[in-house]
Amino acid sequence: MAAAAGAPPPGPPQPPPPPPPEESSDSEPEAEPGSPQKLIRKVSTSGQIRQKTIIKEGMLTKQNNSFQRSKRRYFKLRGRTLYYAKTAKSIIFDEVDLTDASVAESSTKNVNNSFTVITPCRKLILCADNRKEMEDWIAALKTVQNREHFEPTQYSMDHFSGMHNWYACSHARPTYCNVCREALSGVTSHGLSCEVCKFKAHKRCAVRATNNCKWTTLASIGKDIIEDADGIAMPHQWLEGNLPVSAKCTVCDKTCGSVLRLQDWRCLWCKAMVHTSCKESLLTKCPLGLCKVSVIPPTALNSIDSDGFWKASCPPSCTSPLLVFVNSKSGDNQGVKFLRRFKQLLNPAQVFDLMNGGPHLGLRLFQKFDTFRILVCGGDGSVGWVLSEIDSLNLHKQCQLGVLPLGTGNDLARVLGWGSACDDDTQLPQILEKLERASTKMLDRWSVMAYEAKLPRQASSSTVTEDFSEDSEVQQILFYEDSVAAHLSKILTSDQHSVVISSAKVLCETVKDFVARVGKAYEKTTESSEESEVMAKKCSVLKEKLDSLLKTLDDESQASSSLPNPPPTIAEEAEDGDGSGSICGSTGDRLVASACPARPQIFRPREQLMLRANSLKKAIRQIIEHTEKAVDEQNAQTQEQEGFVLGLSESEEKMDHRVCPPLSHSESFGVPKGRSQRKVSKSPCEKLISKGSLSLGSSASLPPQPGSRDGLPALNTKILYPNVRAGMSGSLPGGSVISRLLINADPFNSEPETLEYYTEKCVMNNYFGIGLDAKISLDFNNKRDEHPEKCRSRTKNMMWYGVLGTKELLHRTYKNLEQKVLLECDGRPIPLPSLQGIAVLNIPSYAGGTNFWGGTKEDDTFAAPSFDDKILEVVAVFGSMQMAVSRVIRLQHHRIAQCRTVKISILGDEGVPVQVDGEAWVQPPGYIRIVHKNRAQTLTRDRAFESTLKSWEDKQKCELPRPPSCSLHPEMLSEEEATQMDQFGQAAGVLIHSIREIAQSHRDMEQELAHAVNASSKSMDRVYGKPRTTEGLNCSFVLEMVNNFRALRSETELLLSGKMALQLDPPQKEQLGSALAEMDRQLRRLADTPWLCQSAEPGDEESVMLDLAKRSRSGKFRLVTKFKKEKNNKNKEAHSSLGAPVHLWGTEEVAAWLEHLSLCEYKDIFTRHDIRGSELLHLERRDLKDLGVTKVGHMKRILCGIKELSRSAPAVEA
């Protein structure tokens, strides 16, 4: 009661507290000044929303104030309002009015695919699952803002609309809004920037920005288009303000732009920057800048085809435009930066994001061009995607493809010369320039075909060997088959009648003995009368086949007896001394073509003979198989006999299938020569082969049909394991053709005869892997799919590969892969050692830059690897350690073969990991064939051409200016000029006379100066040789003569500065020196003639160009002080004032030179020691000490002056 009394009296019921608002309602308000700070929440019911037409809907992640508070919400865009709630079935939806809204990406790299919806009173930050979904939402919101109809297919055409593509960013210097002209807020000038044209805006001003983004089509240019006699052209597209600090006006070459206000202009295409007052002085037509070769001008996009795709016309100025595909996910989202930079450099309509629609739209746009280039910015997977789309549109003959490495491995980019990685988007102009100078190479592309079929798995070799060794009875049975095969081979290949008859007799006895022994063995193992009857029928069939063969032989014998001469041989076969030839062929070996088309007339029934031989072989094989089956059934009841039967029946099939794939119809009766006779220890597999012939009867050994493409000789295959192959062929009885064909019989008979039944899984451009490397790649792909945030950078990806490789080093998942797969190269079975994987290489770069083949040059066994020779390299993967070591050391012991086709059979019931160019999957049991598909044109960086071109450009800078044309000066000389040229002609004649006189006694001078003297004499004869007309001398002939004599003077002085100065006598040296001095004096007088002054001596501009060229070749930026410049000028002035060449100086000229260096105190010393010009050029530090120059500063000044004289004087006079 007390408690009740103390309680307050009950009043009216209090309303329940309002529910807390959803997280989605407390979005961050716009913080910029002038924006309302109060957020009014509006809600709608699902019924109200249902009445409106939906534009787009889906789940997005909504951020509030931090990532920790981000929530998944369901968004619906209907009309000009955005609705969101927790789920699609929610009743209450929050709404955002989009009347004055703008949308922008949230960051520069935008790793989380976020975008911001900016309204006058709030800012809504949303994150999509991927970039494509984000761009879909941005495009839908833009169309709503623009009051346009949105269709889901329009997202890929967004850059044709002319609207700005905003993203939020900060700036390192004051930046101004292009809408309100005020500075962007904050110390970092945070605001919005258009990713294409760099239009700047406040977030509140973005909605008021005009749609004047960079032009893409002819319609977007509008009324500013220029029409002239050459057609239509594009004017400059100007954007005001926010110029870089180093901006200079293109017209007046003065600094422009400002950090205090929005002023001056920049062209979005040619990047020209001008003052507002100079803008009218610039040419109206835009030259499109340094990248004009790669740019598609907007005037070329002027129509749309029936499918809604833009069509590009082919203007004359656009011969090989560039189509750019960027994978925005590649390289830790570095692709987003490259995507924006390419849109700024080129036409945005020629830049496409592979994550937003793929390559189809871009290729459709460019397919009308006769030739165009493609640049794929991404990894090897992106390149394969683009090439596959090129296949579907059949554009291989029109386009050349280059690669900019943004992925993880980038193997193809390494091989093509574009490097292993590219992270700096500021280098794109230089990259585009290198792409224009690239050369073209063909890239082989290979189809990876698959046919799924369950194939029995082979057992361990050791177990098989033991089982075979325990049973001598089975070995004797198999011996009969070997004997039959050997004698059949002699009958088919021998042209000697006696050999054929003797082989036929032995064959008859062997078959009879074989039937008798089979009968005895069959009585021991079978008691059923039914099975006895079956065996009796098979033996009777065998007897019929033998009779048919003998009858055919008799017919042939009768035909051959009528001719006097023996027939020619059917085929040439390698004869081994011990009868154990090698199946493996050397480099130049080829399989002998089928003997059927070249059969002589006396062997008319030879086709029947082959058929009879094969039938006989089949019959024997059927009897043996039936015997084995009966033994299997009888002995399956006991444990000991079960092991014997398994060792007989299974191992024979497995070892057959391991080393001998089916022949199909691709091989004929012929074998290549053996390559090696080396004897090595036999593996368990080879021991088994040595005990049994592994021959199986099959129709596959029939001769090919005439005219069949598969009947052609096999291509050369180079195999590294000659010892293994020699062991195989040595185990076959007699080394005969039939025995070698029997080894190729298909024990399962399950492979389709043609590729029509195969399915193309993918196309290989780089490499194919099965086993260990594919397992690592598959694990990495699965981890990247589960945790994409852990695999966003190239460094992290390489670390993950290392971790997964170390894991496989311990687990050894595929340590017995040779028991799970069989390998054929060009139709030849390859016995495999113990390995964990097989790699098939098309390019010499594997798994991120490893040269897994182990070399780039040709050797005695293999040709040099190349990606344009239609040859694959096959290598073995022994383990993770080998893959790691091969990155440092070029290993070669794991090479298997070089071939043109590869076939891999997967045995058992379980699939095996397979990877192509880094994309991995688990391939079910069956067959995999790798065959050549086509070739693609690729752009390869040509460093040699770039170096040569750069040298040529430097040389062009150093060359003298071209002589002015006759139109720049009078056609005839005046009287004063004619008098001056007469004096010049006299000096020229003296110089030529002196050179010819000295050349009579010095053959070296004649050889060195003959060309220059002849050219000067001809030009002199042209001027003075004919009678002078009343009009005077022709100025063009005079100009040519002056130039020739300048060249002659330079070459003569250069010759005298070398060893020739020591060979001449003093009178000859003095005679030639005086002639050269007079020529120099006449050339300096020509400087008074305006149209000859440029030819007479280099001007200041040329000197500057020479200096720049020297500086650029040095590779360093050197600061030259004012004192050093003045000193160099003094040296040049001293040299020019003294007139004569340095090596002709006397003591007076040397003293004058010292006076120019302000070292008058040493004049007497140099004169007393008779230091002349030739000695001066060879003075060294110790010589100066001996002369009495003790001060270090004076010594350095003299040595630098001497160096300058010997280096710059000839260059200036040349």
From Swiss-Prot:
Pfam families: C1_1, DAGK_acc, DAGK_cat, DGKD_4H, PH, SAM_2. Gene3D superfamilies: 2.60.200.40, 3.30.60.20, Pleckstrin-homology domain (PH domain)/Phosphotyrosine-binding domain (PTB), Probable inorganic polyphosphate/atp-NAD kinase, domain 1, Transcription Factor, Ets-1. It is found in: Membrane, Clathrin-coated pit; Cytoplasm. Residues 1-47, 554-584, 655-684 are annotated as: Disordered. Residues 1145-1208 form the SAM domain. The keyword Lipid metabolism applies. GO terms for biological process: diacylglycerol catabolic process; diacylglycerol metabolic process; endocytosis; intracellular signal transduction; lipid phosphorylation; negative regulation of phospholipase C/protein kinase C signal transduction; phosphatidic acid biosynthetic process; phospholipase C-activating G protein-coupled receptor signaling pathway. SUPFAM superfamilies: Cysteine-rich domain (SSF57889), NAD kinase/diacylglycerol kinase-like (SSF111331), PH domain-like (SSF50729), SAM/Pointed domain (SSF47769). Pathway: Lipid metabolism; glycerolipid metabolism. Changing F369A: Decreased interaction with AP2A2. It is an enzyme of class 2 (transferase). GO terms for cellular component: clathrin-coated pit; cytoplasm; cytoplasmic vesicle; cytosol; nucleus; plasma membrane. Residues 53-146 form the PH domain. SMART domains: C1 (SM00109), DAGKa (SM00045), DAGKc (SM00046), PH (SM00233), SAM (SM00454). Keywords: ATP-binding, Cell membrane, Coated pit, Cytoplasm, Endocytosis, Kinase, Lipid metabolism, Membrane, Metal-binding, Nucleotide-binding, Phosphoprotein, Protein transport, Repeat, Transferase, Transport, Zinc, Zinc-finger. Residues 1-52 are annotated as: Regulates association with membranes. Its EC number is 2.7.1.107. Diacylglycerol kinase that converts diacylglycerol/DAG into phosphatidic acid/phosphatidate/PA and regulates the respective levels of these two bioactive lipids. Thereby, acts as a central switch between the signaling pathways activated by these second messengers with different cellular targets and opposite effects in numerous biological processes. By controlling the levels of diacylglycerol, regulates for instance the PKC and EGF receptor signaling pathways and plays a crucial role during development. May also regulate clathrin-dependent endocytosis. Homooligomer. Monomer. Interacts with AP2A2; regulates clathrin-dependent endocytosis. Belongs to the eukaryotic diacylglycerol kinase family. This is Diacylglycerol kinase delta. It comes from Homo sapiens (Human).
